[in-house]
Amino acid sequence: MNSTSLYAAIDLGSNSFHMLVVREAAGSIQTLTRIKRKVRLAAGLNNDNHLSAEAMERGWQCLRLFAERLQDIPQPQIRVVATATLRLAVNAGEFIAKAQTILGCPVQVISGEEEARLIYQGVAHTTGGADQRLVVDIGGASTELVTGTGAQTTSLFSLSMGCVTWLERYFSDRNLAQENFDDAEKAARDVLRPVADELRFHGWKVCVGASGTVQALQEIMMAQGMDERITLAKLQQLKQRAIQCGRLEELEIEGLTLERALVFPSGLAILIAIFTELNIQSMTLAGGALREGLVYGMLHLAVDQDIRSRTLRNIQRRFIVDTEQANRVAKLADNFLKQVENAWHIEPISRELLLSACQLHEIGLSVDFKQAPYHAAYLVRHLDLPGYTPAQKKLLATLLLNQTNPVDLSSLHQQNAVPPRVAEQLCRLLRLAILFAGRRRDDLVPEITLQALNENLTLTLPGDWLAHHPLGKELIDQESQWQSYVHWPLDVR
Protein backbone atom coordinates (compact mmCIF):
# COMPACT_ATOMS: atom_id res chain seq x y z
CA MET A 1 0.00 0.00 0.00
CA ASN A 2 1.22 3.50 -0.82
CA SER A 3 2.09 5.10 2.54
CA THR A 4 1.33 8.59 1.20
CA SER A 5 -2.38 7.76 1.38
CA LEU A 6 -2.13 6.92 5.12
CA TYR A 7 -3.00 9.36 7.90
CA ALA A 8 -2.84 8.96 11.69
CA ALA A 9 -4.50 10.90 14.50
CA ILE A 10 -3.56 10.34 18.14
CA ASP A 11 -5.48 11.78 21.05
CA LEU A 12 -3.78 11.73 24.46
CA GLY A 13 -6.94 11.97 26.53
CA SER A 14 -7.36 12.16 30.29
CA ASN A 15 -9.00 8.72 30.49
CA SER A 16 -7.82 6.91 27.34
CA PHE A 17 -5.18 7.28 24.65
CA HIS A 18 -6.53 6.61 21.15
CA MET A 19 -4.91 6.11 17.77
CA LEU A 20 -6.80 6.18 14.47
CA VAL A 21 -5.09 5.22 11.20
CA VAL A 22 -6.99 5.79 7.96
CA ARG A 23 -6.46 5.54 4.24
CA GLU A 24 -7.70 8.29 1.98
CA ALA A 25 -9.47 6.95 -1.10
CA ALA A 26 -11.44 9.02 -3.60
CA GLY A 27 -12.37 11.74 -1.13
CA SER A 28 -13.54 9.40 1.61
CA ILE A 29 -11.68 7.75 4.46
CA GLN A 30 -11.30 4.07 5.21
CA THR A 31 -10.42 3.11 8.78
CA LEU A 32 -7.44 0.72 8.95
CA THR A 33 -6.52 0.73 12.64
CA ARG A 34 -8.14 1.83 15.88
CA ILE A 35 -6.21 1.31 19.10
CA LYS A 36 -7.48 2.44 22.49
CA ARG A 37 -5.78 2.02 25.85
CA LYS A 38 -7.19 3.06 29.23
CA VAL A 39 -4.33 5.08 30.69
CA ARG A 40 -6.39 7.14 33.20
CA LEU A 41 -3.83 9.94 33.14
CA ALA A 42 -6.15 12.29 35.09
CA ALA A 43 -6.12 9.88 38.05
CA GLY A 44 -2.39 10.68 38.40
CA LEU A 45 -2.97 14.41 39.06
CA ASN A 46 -2.63 15.48 42.71
CA ASN A 47 -4.13 18.61 44.34
CA ASP A 48 -1.18 20.69 43.08
CA ASN A 49 -1.78 19.44 39.51
CA HIS A 50 1.44 17.44 39.60
CA LEU A 51 1.30 14.33 37.38
CA SER A 52 2.59 11.20 39.13
CA ALA A 53 5.51 9.18 37.77
CA GLU A 54 3.25 6.09 37.62
CA ALA A 55 0.65 7.84 35.45
CA MET A 56 3.35 9.17 33.12
CA GLU A 57 4.85 5.69 32.77
CA ARG A 58 1.42 4.25 31.89
CA GLY A 59 1.17 6.89 29.15
CA TRP A 60 4.65 6.28 27.75
CA GLN A 61 4.07 2.52 27.74
CA CYS A 62 0.98 3.04 25.58
CA LEU A 63 2.85 5.37 23.20
CA ARG A 64 5.50 2.69 22.61
CA LEU A 65 2.71 0.54 21.13
CA PHE A 66 1.50 3.41 18.94
CA ALA A 67 5.03 4.28 17.76
CA GLU A 68 5.46 0.96 15.95
CA ARG A 69 2.45 1.69 13.73
CA LEU A 70 3.52 5.28 13.01
CA GLN A 71 6.78 4.19 11.36
CA ASP A 72 4.88 3.48 8.11
CA ILE A 73 3.26 6.93 7.86
CA PRO A 74 4.85 10.18 6.58
CA GLN A 75 5.31 12.63 9.47
CA PRO A 76 3.27 15.49 7.91
CA GLN A 77 0.32 13.05 7.87
CA ILE A 78 0.41 12.43 11.62
CA ARG A 79 -1.23 14.65 14.24
CA VAL A 80 -0.82 14.05 17.95
CA VAL A 81 -2.78 16.19 20.39
CA ALA A 82 -2.98 16.24 24.17
CA THR A 83 -6.03 17.47 26.04
CA ALA A 84 -7.26 18.47 29.53
CA THR A 85 -4.87 16.62 31.89
CA LEU A 86 -1.77 17.80 30.03
CA ARG A 87 -3.23 21.32 29.89
CA LEU A 88 -3.47 21.22 33.69
CA ALA A 89 -0.32 19.31 34.72
CA VAL A 90 2.49 21.59 35.93
CA ASN A 91 5.04 18.97 34.85
CA ALA A 92 3.42 18.32 31.45
CA GLY A 93 6.66 19.39 29.73
CA GLU A 94 8.47 16.34 31.12
CA PHE A 95 5.78 13.96 29.85
CA ILE A 96 5.58 15.59 26.40
CA ALA A 97 9.35 15.68 25.83
CA LYS A 98 9.62 11.92 26.34
CA ALA A 99 6.38 11.30 24.39
CA GLN A 100 7.85 13.13 21.36
CA THR A 101 11.02 11.04 21.57
CA ILE A 102 9.01 7.79 21.69
CA LEU A 103 6.68 8.76 18.81
CA GLY A 104 9.26 10.57 16.69
CA CYS A 105 6.85 13.44 15.98
CA PRO A 106 5.55 16.61 17.68
CA VAL A 107 2.88 16.47 20.39
CA GLN A 108 0.62 19.52 20.57
CA VAL A 109 -1.21 20.46 23.77
CA ILE A 110 -4.41 22.02 22.43
CA SER A 111 -6.64 24.53 24.20
CA GLY A 112 -10.11 23.56 25.38
CA GLU A 113 -11.66 25.70 22.64
CA GLU A 114 -9.54 24.06 19.93
CA GLU A 115 -10.50 20.64 21.30
CA ALA A 116 -14.18 21.63 21.14
CA ARG A 117 -13.76 22.89 17.55
CA LEU A 118 -12.07 19.66 16.42
CA ILE A 119 -14.74 17.53 18.12
CA TYR A 120 -17.42 19.49 16.28
CA GLN A 121 -15.61 19.01 12.94
CA GLY A 122 -15.40 15.26 13.58
CA VAL A 123 -19.14 15.16 14.26
CA ALA A 124 -20.00 17.36 11.25
CA HIS A 125 -18.07 15.03 8.91
CA THR A 126 -19.52 11.77 10.21
CA THR A 127 -22.98 12.33 11.70
CA GLY A 128 -26.26 12.68 9.81
CA GLY A 129 -29.41 14.47 10.90
CA ALA A 130 -30.51 18.10 11.20
CA ASP A 131 -27.97 20.80 10.50
CA GLN A 132 -28.36 22.75 13.73
CA ARG A 133 -26.83 20.70 16.50
CA LEU A 134 -25.51 20.63 20.04
CA VAL A 135 -22.47 18.39 20.52
CA VAL A 136 -21.55 17.04 23.97
CA ASP A 137 -18.27 15.24 24.69
CA ILE A 138 -17.55 14.09 28.25
CA GLY A 139 -13.84 13.38 28.53
CA GLY A 140 -11.72 12.25 31.46
CA ALA A 141 -10.98 15.75 32.82
CA SER A 142 -12.98 18.14 30.62
CA THR A 143 -16.38 18.30 28.96
CA GLU A 144 -16.84 20.05 25.63
CA LEU A 145 -20.16 21.62 24.60
CA VAL A 146 -20.50 23.08 21.11
CA THR A 147 -23.39 24.47 19.10
CA GLY A 148 -23.20 24.87 15.34
CA THR A 149 -24.93 24.80 12.01
CA GLY A 150 -23.49 22.63 9.23
CA ALA A 151 -19.69 23.01 9.35
CA GLN A 152 -19.75 26.27 11.36
CA THR A 153 -19.63 26.43 15.14
CA THR A 154 -21.70 29.13 16.86
CA SER A 155 -20.45 28.63 20.45
CA LEU A 156 -17.60 26.59 21.96
CA PHE A 157 -17.07 25.69 25.61
CA SER A 158 -14.59 23.44 27.39
CA LEU A 159 -15.51 22.92 31.04
CA SER A 160 -13.32 21.57 33.84
CA MET A 161 -15.21 18.42 34.68
CA GLY A 162 -14.77 14.89 33.43
CA CYS A 163 -15.57 11.28 34.23
CA VAL A 164 -12.14 10.59 35.82
CA THR A 165 -11.92 13.79 37.89
CA TRP A 166 -15.57 13.39 39.04
CA LEU A 167 -14.86 9.74 39.91
CA GLU A 168 -11.93 10.78 42.14
CA ARG A 169 -13.91 13.67 43.66
CA TYR A 170 -17.41 12.26 44.24
CA PHE A 171 -17.08 8.48 44.09
CA SER A 172 -13.66 8.08 45.75
CA ASP A 173 -15.25 5.89 48.47
CA ARG A 174 -16.53 3.66 45.61
CA ASN A 175 -20.07 3.97 47.03
CA LEU A 176 -22.90 4.30 44.52
CA ALA A 177 -25.20 6.07 46.97
CA GLN A 178 -27.89 8.66 46.18
CA GLU A 179 -25.80 11.29 48.03
CA ASN A 180 -22.73 10.64 45.83
CA PHE A 181 -24.83 11.12 42.70
CA ASP A 182 -26.54 14.21 44.16
CA ASP A 183 -23.18 15.84 44.97
CA ALA A 184 -21.71 14.95 41.56
CA GLU A 185 -24.78 16.27 39.69
CA LYS A 186 -24.96 19.49 41.75
CA ALA A 187 -21.26 20.20 41.12
CA ALA A 188 -21.69 19.55 37.39
CA ARG A 189 -24.71 21.87 37.22
CA ASP A 190 -22.69 24.59 38.99
CA VAL A 191 -19.99 24.27 36.30
CA LEU A 192 -22.61 24.35 33.51
CA ARG A 193 -24.71 27.26 34.76
CA PRO A 194 -22.45 30.12 33.53
CA VAL A 195 -22.52 28.84 29.91
CA ALA A 196 -26.09 27.50 29.72
CA ASP A 197 -27.71 30.76 28.58
CA GLU A 198 -25.38 31.20 25.60
CA LEU A 199 -25.84 27.58 24.50
CA ARG A 200 -29.63 27.96 24.72
CA PHE A 201 -29.46 31.28 22.86
CA HIS A 202 -27.80 29.59 19.83
CA GLY A 203 -30.20 26.64 20.11
CA TRP A 204 -30.20 23.24 18.40
CA LYS A 205 -32.54 20.85 16.62
CA VAL A 206 -30.59 17.70 17.47
CA CYS A 207 -28.21 16.80 20.27
CA VAL A 208 -25.38 14.32 19.72
CA GLY A 209 -23.00 12.80 22.24
CA ALA A 210 -19.44 11.96 21.27
CA SER A 211 -17.88 10.26 24.28
CA GLY A 212 -17.28 6.93 25.98
CA THR A 213 -20.16 7.60 28.39
CA VAL A 214 -22.60 8.03 25.49
CA GLN A 215 -21.12 5.00 23.70
CA ALA A 216 -21.64 2.96 26.89
CA LEU A 217 -25.27 4.14 27.12
CA GLN A 218 -25.84 3.18 23.50
CA GLU A 219 -24.41 -0.31 24.14
CA ILE A 220 -26.63 -0.74 27.22
CA MET A 221 -29.77 0.30 25.35
CA MET A 222 -29.00 -1.91 22.33
CA ALA A 223 -28.35 -4.89 24.66
CA GLN A 224 -31.63 -4.26 26.50
CA GLY A 225 -33.67 -3.85 23.29
CA MET A 226 -34.53 -0.19 23.94
CA ASP A 227 -34.58 2.38 21.17
CA GLU A 228 -31.28 4.23 20.76
CA ARG A 229 -32.41 7.72 21.81
CA ILE A 230 -30.97 8.73 25.17
CA THR A 231 -33.52 10.53 27.35
CA LEU A 232 -33.44 11.88 30.90
CA ALA A 233 -35.94 9.19 31.97
CA LYS A 234 -33.57 6.44 30.76
CA LEU A 235 -30.60 8.11 32.50
CA GLN A 236 -32.53 8.30 35.79
CA GLN A 237 -33.53 4.64 35.40
CA LEU A 238 -29.86 3.63 34.96
CA LYS A 239 -28.86 5.76 37.96
CA GLN A 240 -31.40 3.89 40.13
CA ARG A 241 -30.00 0.58 38.84
CA ALA A 242 -26.46 1.73 39.76
CA ILE A 243 -27.63 2.80 43.25
CA GLN A 244 -29.19 -0.67 43.74
CA CYS A 245 -25.78 -2.23 42.99
CA GLY A 246 -24.40 -0.29 45.98
CA ARG A 247 -20.66 -0.43 45.23
CA LEU A 248 -18.62 0.44 42.17
CA GLU A 249 -16.96 -2.99 42.08
CA GLU A 250 -20.43 -4.61 42.12
CA LEU A 251 -21.87 -2.47 39.31
CA GLU A 252 -23.62 -4.77 36.84
CA ILE A 253 -25.90 -3.46 34.12
CA GLU A 254 -26.79 -5.56 31.07
CA GLY A 255 -24.73 -4.22 28.14
CA LEU A 256 -22.16 -2.34 30.29
CA THR A 257 -18.66 -3.68 29.69
CA LEU A 258 -16.18 -4.11 32.53
CA GLU A 259 -13.81 -1.71 30.75
CA ARG A 260 -16.36 1.14 30.85
CA ALA A 261 -17.83 0.38 34.29
CA LEU A 262 -15.30 2.31 36.43
CA VAL A 263 -16.07 5.77 35.04
CA PHE A 264 -19.68 5.07 34.09
CA PRO A 265 -21.39 6.44 37.26
CA SER A 266 -19.38 9.69 37.20
CA GLY A 267 -20.03 10.15 33.46
CA LEU A 268 -23.71 9.38 34.04
CA ALA A 269 -23.96 12.04 36.78
CA ILE A 270 -22.41 14.67 34.47
CA LEU A 271 -24.75 13.72 31.63
CA ILE A 272 -27.83 13.92 33.88
CA ALA A 273 -26.70 17.41 34.93
CA ILE A 274 -26.28 18.45 31.26
CA PHE A 275 -29.73 17.09 30.32
CA THR A 276 -31.34 18.84 33.31
CA GLU A 277 -29.55 22.19 33.02
CA LEU A 278 -29.99 22.51 29.24
CA ASN A 279 -33.42 20.83 29.12
CA ILE A 280 -32.27 18.34 26.47
CA GLN A 281 -35.12 16.17 25.13
CA SER A 282 -33.02 13.40 23.58
CA MET A 283 -29.50 12.60 22.39
CA THR A 284 -28.00 10.14 19.90
CA LEU A 285 -24.46 8.88 19.44
CA ALA A 286 -22.14 10.80 17.11
CA GLY A 287 -20.33 9.00 14.30
CA GLY A 288 -16.96 10.56 15.16
CA ALA A 289 -15.28 13.22 17.28
CA LEU A 290 -11.78 14.56 18.03
CA ARG A 291 -9.71 12.03 16.06
CA GLU A 292 -12.01 12.24 13.03
CA GLY A 293 -11.80 16.05 13.26
CA LEU A 294 -7.98 15.81 13.15
CA VAL A 295 -8.01 13.44 10.16
CA TYR A 296 -10.50 15.44 8.09
CA GLY A 297 -8.54 18.59 8.96
CA MET A 298 -5.34 17.07 7.50
CA LEU A 299 -7.24 15.97 4.39
CA HIS A 300 -8.81 19.44 3.92
CA LEU A 301 -12.10 17.79 2.94
CA ALA A 302 -15.15 20.03 2.97
CA VAL A 303 -18.03 19.02 5.20
CA ASP A 304 -20.60 17.36 2.97
CA GLN A 305 -23.98 18.97 3.61
CA ASP A 306 -25.64 15.57 3.35
CA ILE A 307 -23.42 12.92 4.89
CA ARG A 308 -25.89 10.10 4.31
CA SER A 309 -26.05 10.86 0.57
CA ARG A 310 -22.25 10.83 0.38
CA THR A 311 -22.18 7.46 2.15
CA LEU A 312 -24.78 5.98 -0.21
CA ARG A 313 -22.89 7.25 -3.30
CA ASN A 314 -19.61 5.77 -2.07
CA ILE A 315 -21.20 2.36 -1.38
CA GLN A 316 -23.04 2.30 -4.71
CA ARG A 317 -19.73 3.00 -6.48
CA ARG A 318 -17.90 0.36 -4.48
CA PHE A 319 -20.48 -2.38 -5.12
CA ILE A 320 -21.27 -1.36 -8.73
CA VAL A 321 -24.95 -0.71 -8.00
CA ASP A 322 -27.24 0.21 -10.90
CA THR A 323 -28.04 3.74 -9.64
CA GLU A 324 -30.78 4.27 -12.23
CA GLN A 325 -32.65 1.28 -10.84
CA ALA A 326 -31.98 2.36 -7.25
CA ASN A 327 -33.43 5.81 -8.03
CA ARG A 328 -36.42 4.23 -9.80
CA VAL A 329 -37.24 2.11 -6.75
CA ALA A 330 -36.72 5.10 -4.42
CA LYS A 331 -39.01 7.30 -6.52
CA LEU A 332 -41.74 4.65 -6.48
CA ALA A 333 -41.38 4.04 -2.73
CA ASP A 334 -41.60 7.79 -2.11
CA ASN A 335 -44.72 7.97 -4.28
CA PHE A 336 -46.31 5.14 -2.26
CA LEU A 337 -45.30 6.84 0.99
CA LYS A 338 -47.00 10.10 -0.02
CA GLN A 339 -50.21 8.21 -0.81
CA VAL A 340 -50.38 6.57 2.63
CA GLU A 341 -48.75 9.24 4.83
CA ASN A 342 -52.04 10.62 6.17
CA ALA A 343 -53.09 7.16 7.34
CA TRP A 344 -49.69 5.96 8.58
CA HIS A 345 -48.07 9.19 9.89
CA ILE A 346 -44.54 8.18 8.93
CA GLU A 347 -41.89 10.61 10.27
CA PRO A 348 -39.27 12.30 8.01
CA ILE A 349 -36.39 10.21 9.42
CA SER A 350 -38.32 6.98 8.67
CA ARG A 351 -38.90 8.20 5.11
CA GLU A 352 -35.18 8.90 4.75
CA LEU A 353 -34.29 5.41 5.99
CA LEU A 354 -36.77 3.83 3.55
CA LEU A 355 -35.20 5.75 0.64
CA SER A 356 -31.71 4.73 1.86
CA ALA A 357 -32.81 1.08 1.79
CA CYS A 358 -34.02 1.61 -1.80
CA GLN A 359 -30.61 2.99 -2.80
CA LEU A 360 -28.82 -0.02 -1.30
CA HIS A 361 -31.28 -2.83 -2.01
CA GLU A 362 -29.20 -4.42 -4.81
CA ILE A 363 -25.75 -4.42 -3.16
CA GLY A 364 -26.16 -8.13 -2.40
CA LEU A 365 -25.95 -8.85 -6.15
CA SER A 366 -22.25 -7.93 -5.98
CA VAL A 367 -21.78 -11.18 -4.02
CA ASP A 368 -24.27 -13.44 -5.81
CA PHE A 369 -27.86 -13.42 -7.10
CA LYS A 370 -28.59 -16.45 -4.94
CA GLN A 371 -29.57 -15.19 -1.47
CA ALA A 372 -28.86 -11.59 -2.53
CA PRO A 373 -31.07 -10.14 0.29
CA TYR A 374 -28.98 -12.03 2.89
CA HIS A 375 -25.76 -10.73 1.34
CA ALA A 376 -27.17 -7.17 1.25
CA ALA A 377 -28.20 -7.35 4.91
CA TYR A 378 -24.80 -8.75 5.93
CA LEU A 379 -22.92 -6.03 4.04
CA VAL A 380 -24.98 -3.19 5.49
CA ARG A 381 -24.66 -4.59 9.00
CA HIS A 382 -20.86 -4.70 8.74
CA LEU A 383 -20.00 -1.71 6.53
CA ASP A 384 -18.93 1.63 7.99
CA LEU A 385 -21.88 3.95 7.21
CA PRO A 386 -21.05 7.55 8.23
CA GLY A 387 -24.24 9.46 8.96
CA TYR A 388 -26.19 6.41 10.21
CA THR A 389 -26.41 5.38 13.85
CA PRO A 390 -25.91 1.71 14.86
CA ALA A 391 -29.68 1.26 15.29
CA GLN A 392 -30.37 2.81 11.88
CA LYS A 393 -27.84 0.43 10.30
CA LYS A 394 -29.64 -2.48 11.93
CA LEU A 395 -32.98 -1.28 10.53
CA LEU A 396 -31.51 -0.89 7.01
CA ALA A 397 -30.06 -4.41 7.20
CA THR A 398 -33.43 -5.77 8.37
CA LEU A 399 -35.32 -4.04 5.54
CA LEU A 400 -32.86 -5.41 2.97
CA LEU A 401 -33.15 -8.89 4.44
CA ASN A 402 -36.94 -8.69 4.00
CA GLN A 403 -37.04 -7.04 0.55
CA THR A 404 -38.54 -10.18 -1.04
CA ASN A 405 -39.45 -13.82 -0.19
CA PRO A 406 -41.38 -14.70 3.01
CA VAL A 407 -41.17 -12.01 5.70
CA ASP A 408 -39.10 -12.60 8.85
CA LEU A 409 -41.33 -10.61 11.22
CA SER A 410 -39.16 -11.19 14.30
CA SER A 411 -36.18 -9.41 12.68
CA LEU A 412 -38.35 -6.33 12.03
CA HIS A 413 -39.34 -6.34 15.70
CA GLN A 414 -35.77 -6.80 16.98
CA GLN A 415 -34.40 -3.57 15.46
CA ASN A 416 -34.77 -0.49 17.69
CA ALA A 417 -34.46 2.50 15.33
CA VAL A 418 -38.23 2.81 14.83
CA PRO A 419 -41.30 1.18 16.46
CA PRO A 420 -42.03 -2.35 15.13
CA ARG A 421 -45.24 -1.19 13.40
CA VAL A 422 -43.31 1.49 11.46
CA ALA A 423 -40.64 -1.06 10.46
CA GLU A 424 -43.42 -3.28 9.08
CA GLN A 425 -44.91 -0.38 7.11
CA LEU A 426 -41.53 0.60 5.62
CA CYS A 427 -40.90 -3.02 4.68
CA ARG A 428 -44.25 -3.30 2.86
CA LEU A 429 -43.60 -0.15 0.82
CA LEU A 430 -40.04 -1.26 -0.05
CA ARG A 431 -41.24 -4.69 -1.24
CA LEU A 432 -43.96 -3.18 -3.44
CA ALA A 433 -41.60 -0.58 -4.94
CA ILE A 434 -39.03 -3.28 -5.82
CA LEU A 435 -41.73 -5.50 -7.32
CA PHE A 436 -43.27 -2.82 -9.57
CA ALA A 437 -39.90 -1.43 -10.70
CA GLY A 438 -38.73 -4.95 -11.55
CA ARG A 439 -38.60 -4.45 -15.34
CA ARG A 440 -36.01 -1.66 -14.91
CA ARG A 441 -37.68 0.86 -17.24
CA ASP A 442 -39.62 3.98 -16.25
CA ASP A 443 -42.15 3.56 -19.07
CA LEU A 444 -43.04 0.06 -17.83
CA VAL A 445 -43.96 1.14 -14.29
CA PRO A 446 -47.80 1.23 -14.13
CA GLU A 447 -49.86 4.02 -12.56
CA ILE A 448 -50.58 2.67 -9.08
CA THR A 449 -52.97 3.99 -6.45
CA LEU A 450 -52.27 2.90 -2.89
CA GLN A 451 -54.68 3.43 0.00
CA ALA A 452 -54.16 2.55 3.66
CA LEU A 453 -56.80 2.00 6.30
CA ASN A 454 -55.07 1.00 9.54
CA GLU A 455 -52.92 -1.95 8.38
CA ASN A 456 -55.07 -2.73 5.31
CA LEU A 457 -53.47 -1.77 1.99
CA THR A 458 -55.55 -1.48 -1.18
CA LEU A 459 -53.54 -1.39 -4.40
CA THR A 460 -55.36 -0.29 -7.57
CA LEU A 461 -53.84 -0.91 -11.02
CA PRO A 462 -55.00 0.36 -14.45
CA GLY A 463 -58.05 -1.59 -15.72
CA ASP A 464 -56.53 -4.31 -17.92
CA TRP A 465 -52.97 -4.27 -16.57
CA LEU A 466 -53.20 -7.64 -14.81
CA ALA A 467 -54.70 -9.31 -17.92
CA HIS A 468 -51.78 -8.12 -20.08
CA HIS A 469 -49.03 -8.93 -17.57
CA PRO A 470 -49.36 -12.61 -16.54
CA LEU A 471 -45.88 -12.73 -14.94
CA GLY A 472 -46.56 -9.45 -13.14
CA LYS A 473 -49.89 -10.86 -11.89
CA GLU A 474 -48.18 -14.00 -10.62
CA LEU A 475 -45.57 -11.94 -8.73
CA ILE A 476 -48.27 -9.72 -7.19
CA ASP A 477 -50.36 -12.74 -6.13
CA GLN A 478 -47.27 -14.28 -4.54
CA GLU A 479 -46.48 -11.01 -2.72
CA SER A 480 -50.06 -10.72 -1.49
CA GLN A 481 -49.81 -14.26 -0.11
CA TRP A 482 -46.46 -13.59 1.62
CA GLN A 483 -47.89 -10.44 3.23
CA SER A 484 -51.01 -12.33 4.37
CA TYR A 485 -48.80 -14.90 6.18
CA VAL A 486 -47.71 -12.12 8.58
CA HIS A 487 -51.22 -10.57 8.80
CA TRP A 488 -50.54 -7.68 6.43
CA PRO A 489 -53.77 -7.46 4.39
CA LEU A 490 -53.04 -6.50 0.75
CA ASP A 491 -56.01 -6.15 -1.58
CA VAL A 492 -55.09 -5.86 -5.29
CA ARG A 493 -57.67 -4.46 -7.75
From Swiss-Prot:
Coiled-coil positions are none
Record keywords: Hydrolase
A molecular function annotated in GO for this UniProt entry is: guanosine-5'-triphosphate,3'-diphosphate diphosphatase activity
Q: Which Gene3D superfamilies match?
A: 3.30.420.40, Exopolyphosphatase. Domain 2, Hypothetical protein af1432
* Known role: Catalyzes the conversion of pppGpp to ppGpp. Guanosine pentaphosphate (pppGpp) is a cytoplasmic signaling molecule which together with ppGpp controls the 'stringent response', an adaptive process that allows bacteria to respond to amino acid starvation, resulting in the coordinated regulation of numerous cellular activities.
**One short Pfam family name for this protein?**
Ppx-GppA
Full protein name? Guanosine-5'-triphosphate,3'-diphosphate pyrophosphatase
Give the pathway annotation: Purine metabolism; ppGpp biosynthesis; ppGpp from GTP: step 2/2
**Known catalytic reactions:** guanosine 3'-diphosphate 5'-triphosphate + H2O = guanosine 3',5'-bis(diphosphate) + phosphate + H(+)
- UniProt-listed Enzyme Commission number(s): 3.6.1.40
SUPFAM superfamilies listed in its UniProt record: Actin-like ATPase domain, HD-domain/PDEase-like
Q: Which GO terms describe its biological process?
A: guanosine pentaphosphate catabolic process; guanosine tetraphosphate biosynthetic process; nucleobase-containing small molecule interconversion
Family from the record: Belongs to the GppA/Ppx family. GppA subfamily.
